[in-house]
């Protein structure tokens, strides 16, 4: 059996580490061609020692020099590259069959698009790719025969319970709606009067999942679920009015599909990203992920509730951007990334994140942008607007 040759973008993040854990369990099935790890050079060097990729990519020349020194010390022959073009190169290399797109934020878009242009199998964990450029990305993938497999636990759950021959037309398969579950994050029951004083350390402590700091804050505001709504819209060709969100604090049911006959099919499992990663990497097989069995005896009640927009205004803003379409999701994402970075840096309050996003969505912007240059230009304009607004909040 010829192993699948992988590029893993974002290998030092939580998704990347989980991917490598799954890969390590199946050395006969996978070979790592390239790893990309931004600035965590020590962790990336250790990964290179273990998986021996041809290439490792970091953010800039300074971090490249540090990584080269570590690899030379350890006798590892991996070639070091740096910069945005290097990400594109390792994602689109002829030797590569599959690309794990796990870079956080819109910065991951060009490399994901490059993989789509080369017809790769894309394991999509970077939700911003579809939020910012859904129409462009999906059309590029279709035109070049690229397979787009969702790694996000919610979308992967939907993917697992949709009919195998799903054509992207809900009515043909008797589908009434797609339901994304959300944990509600660490502040689901907190007093709203305390939200102004929430600290970054509090916001990144997710009750169920192990995630990076930015995504953890997005979970706390439920912007993460808002971005996932937009992602589901593009992945499954699902109209906005057929998408639902339900809060499920236990994170055991990862998402559901409601059918016209009254049936609801759900995917359940322990909250561990290795499950959706293994499902995508192993298709059409089911391969070992290293995740333990779900223990039904140990489960208490499974509970559900509707999201409260007063508690989670970012989710409401995401609904509005999805319904508006055009460049609105791009603006939503750029403003949120700028605001979350400012919050994590101690510049603004937790409640200022939604205020910043709302401000940017109220500005004038193009109704629709059809190329990556225009999308990245709008992204840059919105970030500048967000930074200017943040300056008024200090």
UniProtKB/Swiss-Prot annotation:
Keyword Nucleus: no
Substrates-to-products reaction catalysed: 2-C-methyl-D-erythritol 4-phosphate + NADP(+) = 1-deoxy-D-xylulose 5-phosphate + NADPH + H(+)
Recorded metabolic or biological pathway in which this protein acts: Isoprenoid biosynthesis; isopentenyl diphosphate biosynthesis via DXP pathway; isopentenyl diphosphate from 1-deoxy-D-xylulose 5-phosphate: step 1/6
Positions annotated to bind 1-deoxy-D-xylulose 5-phosphate: 127, 153-154, 183, 206, 219, 224-225, 228
Binding site for NADPH: 12-15, 39-40, 126, 128, 212
Gene3D superfamilies: 1.10.1740.10, NAD(P)-binding Rossmann-like Domain
Superkingdom of this protein's organism: Bacteria
Top enzyme category: oxidoreductase
Annotated protein name in UniProt: 1-deoxy-D-xylulose 5-phosphate reductoisomerase
NCBIfam families: Dxr, PRK05447.1-1, PRK12464.1
Keywords, alphabetical: Isoprene biosynthesis, Manganese, Metal-binding, NADP, Oxidoreductase
Cofactor: Mg(2+); Mn(2+)
Annotated Mn(2+) binding sites: 152, 154, 228
Record-stated family: Belongs to the DXR family.
InterPro entries noted in UniProt: DXP_reductoisomerase, DXP_reductoisomerase_C, DXP_reductoisomerase_N, DXPR_C, DXPR_C_sf, NAD(P)-bd_dom_sf
Protein function: Catalyzes the NADPH-dependent rearrangement and reduction of 1-deoxy-D-xylulose-5-phosphate (DXP) to 2-C-methyl-D-erythritol 4-phosphate (MEP).
GO molecular function, one term: 1-deoxy-D-xylulose-5-phosphate reductoisomerase activity
Example of a GO biological process term: isopentenyl diphosphate biosynthetic process, methylerythritol 4-phosphate pathway involved in terpenoid biosynthetic process
Protein EC: 1.1.1.267
């Amino acid at each position: 059996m010829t192993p699948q040759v992988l590029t893993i973008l974002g290998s030092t993040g939580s998704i990347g580490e989980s991917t490598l854990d799954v890969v390590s369990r199946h050395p006969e099935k996978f070979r790592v061609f390239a790893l990309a790890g931004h600035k965590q050079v020590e962790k990336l060097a250790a990964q290179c020692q273990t998986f021996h990729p041809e290439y490792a990519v970091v953010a800039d020349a300074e971090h490249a020099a540090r990584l080269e020194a570590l690899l030379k010390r350890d006798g590892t022959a991996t070639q070091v590259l740096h910069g945005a073009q290097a990400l594109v190169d390792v994602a689109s290399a002829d030797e590569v069959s599959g690309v794990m797109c796990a870079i956080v934020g819109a910065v991951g878009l060009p490399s994901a698009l490059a993989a789509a242009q080369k017809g790769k199998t894309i394991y999509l964990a970077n939700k911003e790719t579809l939020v910012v450029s859904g129409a462009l990305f999906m059309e590029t993938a279709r035109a070049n025969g690229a397979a787009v497999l969702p790694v996000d636990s919610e979308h992967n759950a939907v993917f697992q319970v949709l009919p195998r021959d799903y054509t992207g037309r809900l009515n043909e398969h008797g589908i009434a709606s797609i339901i994304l579950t959300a944990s509600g994050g660490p502040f689901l029951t907190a007093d709203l009067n305390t939200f102004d004083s929430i600290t970054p350390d509090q916001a990144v402590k997710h009750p169920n999942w192990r995630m990076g700091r930015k995504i953890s804050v997005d979970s706390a505001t439920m912007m993460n679920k808002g971005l996932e709504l937009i992602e589901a819209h593009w992945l499954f060709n699902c109209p906005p009015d057929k998408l639902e969100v339900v809060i499920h604090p236990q994170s055991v049911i990862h998402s559901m599909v409601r059918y016209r006959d009254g049936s609801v099919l759900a995917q359940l499992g322990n909250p561990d990203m290795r499950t959706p990663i293994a499902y995508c990497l192993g298709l059409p097989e089911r391969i070992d992920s290293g995740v333990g069995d779900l223990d039904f005896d140990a489960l208490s009640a499974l509970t559900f509730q509707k999201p409260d927009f007063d508690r989670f205004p970012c989710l409401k803003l995401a609904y509005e951007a999805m319904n508006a379409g055009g460049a609105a999701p791009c603006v939503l994402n750029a403003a949120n990334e700028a605001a979350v970075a400012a919050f994590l840096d101690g510049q603004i309050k937790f409640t200022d994140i939604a205020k910043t996003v709302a401000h940017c969505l109220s500005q004038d912007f193009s109704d629709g942008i059809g190329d990556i240059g225009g999308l990245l230009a709008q992204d840059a304009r919105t970030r500048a607007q967000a930074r200017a607004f943040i300056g008024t909040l200090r």
